């Protein structure tokens, strides 16, 4: 039987050009104090912590946690400035609430396992980071996706019976296309 032709009102497929996601990062020539956390540093230090607790590994960053275990209820300060004066981005997209300019870290409980690198800029920083970057900026980029099939599983256990289970599976390229 011959394949039926879809109706005129059915979904149409359009091929688009490649989209590249970029993020603004400070370099050695940029007149701003900054620190970078590589993927290896993040992987080595992220067990049992949320992102704000990991950020406390950088100079001038302080994290306080209401729960006492480093997960949830964590707030940050950079050079004494509260989090509402820090611009936080993932792949260049702001995570700050447009109303209060806070970042609700509760909404991203496992983002840390997808982060490839982090740059913390101390001070006003690069002006492209928006008006909220008065105190500084936290720029995160996600880890690159591989072209081959891959998988990863991890289990973590910590104080006060805290635990984390994570599974990541990547199809890679299928038929020379991303799925």
Report residues per predicted region.
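Extracytoplasmic
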Residues: 16-18, 29-34, 58, 73, ...
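Short beta-strands and strand-coil junctions in structured, solvent-facing domains, enriched
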Residues: 27-28, 64, 85, 95-97, ...
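Outer-membrane beta-barrel translocator/receptor signature
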Residues: 100, 113-116, 127-179
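Short acidic/polar hinge/loop motifs at secondary-structure boundaries
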Residues: 94-122, 141
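Transmembrane beta-barrel domains of outer membrane proteins
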Residues: 54, 79, 121, 141, ...
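Short, polar/charged loop or turn motifs at beta-strand boundaries
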Residues: 34-51, 76-81, 157
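Short, acidic, small-residue-rich periplasmic hinge/interaction motif at the N-terminus
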Residues: 2-44, 83
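Extracytoplasmic beta-strand/coil segments of soluble accessory domains associated
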Residues: 52-94, 116
